[in-house]
């Protein structure tokens, strides 16, 4: 299993890491993981910020009920932010089986999506206008059995830049080219 890790910056200028792994020689599949680089720093920042907030409220001689309301609301907001933040996104490509797309959130919550191999029509890097700027997204073209075409966006939460997407695209295109060669023979 060959593995490589490359560091990039996403469209919001946050550091991300792309890890690509080759899976087996018989299947010739691969896995791509894009994750935020400073995951530990946010937890460390939150652990120092919370006690500082408690001490500040105590020294301001706030009413005790206001102290508990501020504390509870701060805890609720902190938990919500931790719960909703995407930690990493993974795309696993196994030829003749399909593409599994996994998004991991805080508190080990995951969402999985699967695209069957027979329904994959292609992969493209799509140019999108978003809030007065142009961003690039990696998209899988899916045709269902009734020949309706739909687009499935990959890495929509970590939002890697074009240079990162091109690396993933080239590997996916190699695998999909093998699919078309095998289906013709």
Which residues are covered by each model-predicted region?
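N-terminal membrane-targeting/pre-transmembrane regions
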Residues: 1-60
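Short amphipathic beta-strand/extended segments with alternating polar/hydrophobic composition
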Residues: 43-49, 111-117, 149-157
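Amphipathic alpha-helical interface elements that mediate macromolecular binding in regulatory proteins
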Residues: 54, 74, 97, 118-121, ...
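Hydrophobic alpha-helical transmembrane segments
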Residues: 59-73
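Conserved beta-hairpin
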Residues: 77-124
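Extended serine/threonine-enriched, polar tracts that run as long, contiguous segments within proteins
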Residues: 114, 128-132
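A membrane-cytosol interface segment of integral membrane proteins
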Residues: 134-185
